[in-house]
A protein has these predicted regions:
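Serine-esterase "nucleophile elbow" of acetyl-processing enzymes
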Residues: 8, 18-68, 84-92, 96, ...
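Structural recognition of the beta-strand scaffold that forms the well-ordered cores
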Residues: 29-33, 61-66, 94-100, 138-143, ...
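Oxyanion-hole/transition-state-stabilizing segment in secreted/luminal serine hydrolases
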Residues: 33, 44-45, 53, 67, ...
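Solvent-exposed loop/turn segments at secondary-structure junctions
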Residues: 36-40, 67-73, 95, 102-107, ...
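Conserved catalytic region of serine esterases and O-acyltransferases that act on ester linkages
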Residues: 42, 200-312
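Active-site segments of SGNH/GDSL-like serine hydrolases
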Residues: 99-105, 126-164, 186, 195
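Extracellular serine-dependent O-acyl
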Residues: 135-144, 162-199, 214-237
Length: 312
């Protein structure tokens, strides 16, 4: 059983209950971009499960293109790796979730101007394209999450959070300048951390645990105006693990296709060697697995919204 979240946290969430709901359209292709926070969303999948449960007949396509250590101005890839714009066109992206600011925050106040400029340029570039062939993508800029104070042997969380606060504010400013939706996870998560003493949400002060992903998925749903139930918060393990496992399997197939362990044999200088001869065909087979997994998700009975977070 999961522990109750405090009443104070409920009150803090109350301000979000009037948030304008994010537009989710039938058949939307949703792509998640960003750093380790983004990449790890596929491990537990609570937010994606929520989307399918909230819009059970929309046949949503979700692709996690998060890459650990990515920064808005620096996304290091193997030689020959496809350009981001080409990938987004292949996925016909309608809605983008951008998760940046945490890694950049280590530059402190001196790096703020550079971050804001690069973020603005990135948003402008994305808004100038129509990956779906019809319109510019809708964009949600997601703030970094705070450090969690869990161990005296880890870096000072207060100092780190002062930096992250600067970059969260900077992200919000740039989002407003470009007419992009901003989702603040920093403030409510910091509030949660200060009011929960018996349940940690990260494994190391930075990366979310399964419980943390479960809790943050609720923050995201409320912050996007997609979940307005303020009567109570769930306290139990989710009932329908079968669907969440299916989401994980689809994401695993995609991740091993898109981000293979040794991409040099696919995109780089070794893609003509004997060992790489059959990889192109195997990748096509993997794409078929991704599509089949997605069709299976669409056909499955979706968990009720109360079951996504295990309310009892």
């Amino acid at each position: 059983m999961r522990s109750h979240l405090p009443i104070l946290f409920l009150i803090f969430w109350g301000g979000w209950l009037s948030a304008e709901p994010l537009r989710i359209r039938k058949g939307d292709s949703i792509v998640i971009l960003g750093n380790t926070f983004a990449e790890r969303m596929q491990l537990f999948g609570y937010f994606e499960v929520f989307l399918h449960s909230r819009f059970p007949d929309h046949n949503l396509r979700v692709r996690n293109m998060g890459w650990s250590a990515d920064e808005v101005h620096q996304r290091i890839r193997p030689q020959g790796f496809p350009k981001l714009s080409a990938e987004l066109k292949e996925h016909r992206a309608d809605l983008l979730f951008l998760c940046f600011g945490f890694n950049e925050s280590f530059q402190g106040a001196t790096g703020l101007d550079h971050y804001k400029a690069e973020l603005g340029n990135f948003l402008k570039k994305l808004q100038g394209q129509n990956f779906n062939g019809e319109s510019a993508p809708r964009i949600v800029l997601v703030s970094p999450i705070p450090f969690e104070k869990i161990d005296k042997g880890l870096p000072n969380s207060d100092e780190g959070n002062r930096r992250i606060q600067l970059y969260t504010t900077a992200s919000e400013t740039v989002a407003q300048e470009h007419g992009v939706r901003f989702l603040d996870l920093f403030a409510p998560m910091l509030e949660q951390a200060s009011n929960i003493s018996n349940r940690k949400i990260t494994i190391n002060g930075v990366h979310l645990s399964e419980y943390g992903d479960w809790a943050v998925s609720q923050l995201m749903a409320r912050g996007l105006g997609l979940w307005r139930d303020d009567l109570s918060l769930p306290t139990a393990t989710p009932r329908d693990e079968k669907f969440r496992r299916a989401v994980y399997e689809k994401n695993h197939h995609y991740f091993t296709w898109w981000h293979p362990p040794n991409a040099s044999y696919i995109h780089g200088g070794r893609n003509k060697t004997r060992g790489a001869m059959h990889l192109a065909n195997e990748r096509e087979q993997r794409k078929l697995l991704i599509e089949a997994s997605e069709r299976e998700l669409w056909a499955m009975e979706k968990p009720k919204l109360s079951e996504v977070w295990g309310a009892e």
